[in-house]
Design a protein with these regions (language model features):
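Conserved short alpha-helical segments that host acidic/polar catalytic motifs at enzyme active sites
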Residues: 1-254
Length: 254
């Protein structure tokens, strides 16, 4: 796909890759964590603030939510990157990229994926209440997203993990963004959590209204008395393709 660049030529409009969790890489490089079997742990891939106090507050908030949901906090990892490959525009807004590993307790498969979804939605709400910015790229026991305000050539150079032969996946879905109706940013790079999509959805407002009209009934069918915790389904501050991803994620987990 065509990829846009900023005025400094080294700042891309965003690029990334969606893969299966690199289980072997984690087991062999994250030595301070004792991993359960594959499928029994999930990973939150996150953009967090560079300011340490804000970052620590967000991390403690997430840990509290995980424990409230009855799951285990296995540990944290700072994703190794090479910031020197970035353009000046990307460097100015570069976040700290962290991974939180979550152990499943008495659940697996789709039930665990739904619990990770509930944890993320609670974390998003509490972060907003705290007035702290964060972004969860992916929150799953099955897949993970590596992305940033980079070009396709920079993606592998920036993330050390992507150059490691122990990073193994049965698939890799790659996207390079050409920003049109929204300004480039780290979180707006693709892939989204589930989909790669070029946007330009002509029926966007009609789709949003249709989802608003049926989301409560849909949520109650799957989440019962916890439906309120996943509403609204769409983050209307995002791009059209990210809202499509919101809808797809919800329907997939339902």
């Amino acid at each position: 796909h065509r990829g846009g660049q900023g005025s400094d030529a080294k700042t891309g409009d965003g690029a990334g890759i969606l893969t299966q969790l690199p289980d072997r890489l984690f087991r062999e490089t994250v030595r301070h964590i004792s991993f359960p079997k594959k499928g029994d742990y999930g990973v939150f891939m996150m953009f967090l603030p560079r300011e340490e106090r804000e970052r620590m507050r967000l991390e403690r908030t997430l840990e509290s939510i995980i424990l409230t949901e009855g799951q285990d906090v296995l540990g944290w990892r700072t994703v190794p990157v090479r910031s020197e490959v970035l353009g000046s525009g990307a460097r100015r807004t570069e976040p700290v990229i962290r991974q939180c590993f979550i152990g499943a307790q008495a659940m697996e498969g789709l039930t665990f994926e739904r619990t990770l979804f509930l944890i993320r939605r609670a974390f998003e709400r509490e972060s907003e209440q705290l007035g702290l910015e964060q972004y969860v790229l992916s929150s799953s026991s099955e897949t993970i997203v590596y992305k940033g305000l980079v070009t396709t050539d920079q993606l592998r150079a920036y993330f050390d993990d992507l150059r490691d032969e122990r990073y193994q996946s049965g698939f890799g879905i790659v996207h390079s963004r050409f920003s049109t109706n929204t300004f480039p940013s780290w979180k707006r790079a693709h892939p989204n959590r589930y989909l790669i999509h070029n946007g330009e959805i002509n029926t966007l407002q009609g789709n949003i209204r249709a989802m608003r009209g049926r989301e409560r009934r849909l949520a109650e069918t799957t989440y019962g008395n916890r439906a309120e915790e996943v509403l609204p389904i769409l983050d209307e501050t995002g791009s059209d393709s990210s809202m499509l991803d919101n809808a797809f994620e919800f329907l997939h987990l339902s």
